[in-house]
Amino acid sequence: MFARKPPGAAPLGAMPVPDQPSSASEKTSSLSPGLNTSNGDGSETETTSAILASVKEQELQFERLTRELEAERQIVASQLERCKLGSETGSMSSMSSAEEQFQWQSQDGQKDIEDELTTGLELVDSCIRSLQESGILDPQDYSTGERPSLLSQSALQLNSKPEGSFQYPASYHSNQTLALGETTPSQLPARGTQARATGQSFSQGTTSRAGHLAGPEPAPPPPPPPREPFAPSLGSAFHLPDAPPAAAAAALYYSSSTLPAPPRGGSPLAAPQGGSPTKLQRGGSAPEGATYAAPRGSSPKQSPSRLAKSYSTSSPINIVVSSAGLSPIRVTSPPTVQSTISSSPIHQLSSTIGTYATLSPTKRLVHASEQYSKHSQELYATATLQRPGSLAAGSRASYSSQHGHLGPELRALQSPEHHIDPIYEDRVYQKPPMRSLSQSQGDPLPPAHTGTYRTSTAPSSPGVDSVPLQRTGSQHGPQNAAAATFQRASYAAGPASNYADPYRQLQYCPSVESPYSKSGPALPPEGTLARSPSIDSIQKDPREFGWRDPELPEVIQMLQHQFPSVQSNAAAYLQHLCFGDNKIKAEIRRQGGIQLLVDLLDHRMTEVHRSACGALRNLVYGKANDDNKIALKNCGGIPALVRLLRKTTDLEIRELVTGVLWNLSSCDALKMPIIQDALAVLTNAVIIPHSGWENSPLQDDRKIQLHSSQVLRNATGCLRNVSSAGEEARRRMRECDGLTDALLYVIQSALGSSEIDSKTVENCVCILRNLSYRLAAETSQGQHMGTDELDGLLCGEANGKDAESSGCWGKKKKKKKSQDQWDGVGPLPDCAEPPKGIQMLWHPSIVKPYLTLLSECSNPDTLEGAAGALQNLAAGSWKWSVYIRAAVRKEKGLPILVELLRIDNDRVVCAVATALRNMALDVRNKELIGKYAMRDLVHRLPGGNNSNNTASKAMSDDTVTAVCCTLHEVITKNMENAKALRDAGGIEKLVGISKSKGDKHSPKVVKAASQVLNSMWQYRDLRSLYKKDGWSQYHFVASSSTIERDRQRPYSSSRTPSISPVRVSPNNRSASAPASPREMISLKERKTDYECTGSNATYHGAKGEHTSRKDAMTAQNTGISTLYRNSYGAPAEDIKHNQVSAQPVPQEPSRKDYETYQPFQNSTRNYDESFFEDQVHHRPPASEYTMHLGLKSTGNYVDFYSAARPYSELNYETSHYPASPDSWV
């Protein structure tokens, strides 16, 4: 199309090659504003007129040919659009592979048109030469080597998208400033393999089409020295790599300057500008194939002088056309380097190719009045812009689902067939395949892009060059031009690959007038906004053709568009906008966006489902957005999500739906609605199928894959949250067929594999722990143990030996008791069939999986959950609790629990200590713990002079309290254990705590330690040893004002101090000597009082308020011996960290919901705050681990539980069982 100039023959006015000095930038070339006729006579004037008339005819011919060629392209685009509409998804997914490059061959008729264009160019060349030879035209103003400027933007950009080309036939003055540079193909930063690896490149020739050859990628060129003539500015000339002046091949680089800078530095042609972003740049070459690449160069912290960011291209877009035989080349132009403009006052126009006007309406009006004359707008007469949303025939955008590590593609927006005012978008947005849901399970990028910022691909359109966008590293102002001018498009190559944080950077920057801008105004100074109009671009108001950012109401309105691709793109853009921005999330809710997104869940197109779910997941992420969660529920969002989950087979959509449900489940108000609407579907459609429970004979590899399923992980996370919603929620989940079996199967199949530490296993364990909470009180099997059984246990145990000698009554009762006992050996009584369903929650067979987790798992949350489950199961006087305690001893679980006391994790130590306390309710367990675990328990107490104080000081008050309570239970009615506590140095530490007067420890800890000391003083036989060690009665009892009235009655009187933090209830005396029958009678008479107190405690506990001291003492007197932990909900941020007492209906300690990435990025990093933003495990509040020992005047679960179920004062463990396996290991 263009004749190549021989090496070294560039005219004086041609743009210098890189090796030329920067002063050559003054010699930029353009057509003179007017023809110089002052030195010629009349004949010269007539000759000039004839030449100009000839040129005008050529322009008209060019316009006609261009129209014909554009018509051909529109026909091809229409055919492609019809093919695309016939597919189900309306996308070009077959073309989304990053390993392929497609070449759209031109029609046969286009060859003829291009030949005519070439012929026309030669005629224009001859006219210009005639003007120069006659002396009319200064050779420095125009050279034949630069005749490509005669082309209209339509002629030069024929390989833009058929769906809406920017380029249209124009006049001789063509909105293009062209400069010629000489270079060799070897010096171009060719993009061969990398181009294929990072984005699609469609090769379209503007003239005689040649196949695109992707040769081997040359080594990245070193950063060249600063060359101002080639650095980009508002009117950005292209910059070239270093090349010898006598290069064998020529490459034409020309730029379309939206806002050329005014003349500066005394030169009317060169205007260096610093800190300006490059605009769309094109490179062309003689009749060779052309390939486009558009690296992205933006940063959320760029200097304010850069132009306002656009809807899709908030950074400069550099489009380079390479010669044949070369790989597609990318030249990344950082927006902050200095540059020079090669422009002409007449021919440098604002063509806005690939970008759009960034001036606000006011500024553009002033700008137009100052800069434009009446001849500037003839170009726009035929170049009308098409509204992107219309997506009419030949210009409807395709929606291609592409890999997350690829860059979004440029979308053409104009069509000569559709005269619609421009509105908001210039590219179709595409969400990424958001499959990385946690830092530990994120999908890493390919090696070429690991650790770099990479946006997800925007949809490609038929026959359109894919233009990947990339960020450059201009973060904090202008960078050195030498280091930034020639960045390779490779993300890791070159010293200029200086990128900002790839995770939280904004990809798109709205315009100045958009209230949703994430970076604020970014207009350059007024002085830099001047541009020179051409003769044909002065008539019309340029504001008609300026592109702007979409306003939020417009994007929300597009959710109702008639084309699914527009709806999908709008939803994906909303997902991007609201990422990490709670204000935008609230605004979307106020403008009705949530309702429209919920409506899209029932759409027929899969892509719409995907984008809508992604937007909803971001909208309902975070504690600050509970209003959005409730709004989604009020819009019918939960049933809509459930319907979509039930009918879709797309794995990504199932992940998104379950992710939205997980986010919703962290809101307390939505837990029961989720259980009502989604529990059955989550269980039957996700958990059971993905667990593999129904087909247990599956291969082992499938089991491992199931555990890594994000859908299963999300579903179990959702149920983990809702399982803490209260008694009704637990009851429904226990009764849900297959749920308990599937959760246990997930755990059992993970044992011995690397998946034992996975989040899915953690969620399953925590669900089972919650469902194990208050089993005896909330299940029908537990409630069968009513008053008759209580009476039998009371009579048989209370009278002790007297019952044996009193005749048939006592013997019968003892016989019944012995039949109900199981000491860990032989078959279980009352258990003829294998357990199933809810029975598996309390059956002793569940002990072994829990103990295996405790011995093999390294996930502290899983360890805490398993220990808490055993703690819940071993609580109380229910016969299954007795069996659980025996089973733990049989399975050698006590050493496992004691070993966990030594790990450096406060929450795990707290859970294990409490579990040991419940295990010590069994007499044999108590003996073993006192013999083998006393030193470990004492070691965990703060204080003393040993070298382990540092670790103890780091323990929370809850953990210290739990250890004290365990010690108290171990020494109760066991003098040998009390002596072992003294021998282990426990007295010194306990006295140090009790005498701290609250300076170092909370009152709760002080009181718990005082209770242990008081219990030790009750053993009169040990007092001499205490005095021998230097201790007196003052050290044991003086600091505990609450036990004054019990100080005179030692254990020899067979009485446990009634205000002991552990022995606070009738049930709490299970391991003490039998009480008198009169006490047993009084216990039964107080039953109604217990129930009333329980209701009162429940009320105050639910309110999270302190009860009165009277209520607290009553609750203590009615408590049970077992220390029950509250339900272990999934961590949730919404619980109050200053809450002093846990609730009967517990909540989660920290939020486990998540928000996805920005929809157009994929990174090895995964989440922002929680699950889909950053899976950060927030430390549970102290309230969740408050030991409910009557140490605070608050209603708590122990009070509530004991009031609801006033069990026997004595436990099964009172007697010894000779056949029990009592060995420690």
Curated annotation (Swiss-Prot):
Changing residue 810 to R: Has no effect on Wnt signaling. It holds the Pfam family Arm. The modification Phosphoserine is found at residues 267, 276, 327, 360, 415, 461, 514, 1065, 1076. Residues 49-84 form a coiled coil. Changing residue 454 to H: Found in autism; likely pathogenic; hypomorphic variant affecting Wnt signaling. O-glycosylated. Its main location: nucleus. SUPFAM superfamilies: ARM repeat. Changing residue 330 to H: Has no effect on Wnt signaling. InterPro entries: ARM-like, ARM-type_fold, Armadillo, Plakophilin/d_Catenin. Residues 217-229 have a biased composition (Pro residues). PROSITE patterns: ARM_REPEAT (PS50176). GO terms for cellular component: adherens junction; cytoplasm; dendrite; nucleus; perikaryon; plasma membrane; postsynaptic density. Expressed in brain; highest expression is observed in fetal brain. The modification Phosphotyrosine is found at residue 516. The modification Omega-N-methylarginine is found at residues 209, 264, 282, 296. Changing residue 862 to M: Found in patients with autism; uncertain significance; has no effect on Wnt signaling. It is found in: Nucleus; Cell junction, Adherens junction; Cell projection, Dendrite; Perikaryon. Residues 20-51, 98-108, 172-187, 195-209, 299-312, 469-478, 1050-1059 have a biased composition (Polar residues). Residues 1-51, 87-117, 134-242, 256-312, 432-483, 514-542, 1042-1077 are annotated as: Disordered. PANTHER family: CATENIN DELTA-2, PLAKOPHILLIN-RELATED. Has a critical role in neuronal development, particularly in the formation and/or maintenance of dendritic spines and synapses. Involved in the regulation of Wnt signaling. It probably acts on beta-catenin turnover, facilitating beta-catenin interaction with GSK3B, phosphorylation, ubiquitination and degradation. Functions as a transcriptional activator when bound to ZBTB33. May be involved in neuronal cell adhesion and tissue morphogenesis and integrity by regulating adhesion molecules. It is linked to Defects in CTNND2, including deleterious missense and copy number variants (CNVs) are involved in autism, a complex multifactorial, pervasive developmental disorder characterized by impairments in reciprocal social interaction and communication, restricted and stereotyped patterns of interests and activities, and the presence of developmental abnormalities by 3 years of age. Most individuals with autism also manifest moderate intellectual disability. This is Catenin delta-2. The gene is CTNND2.
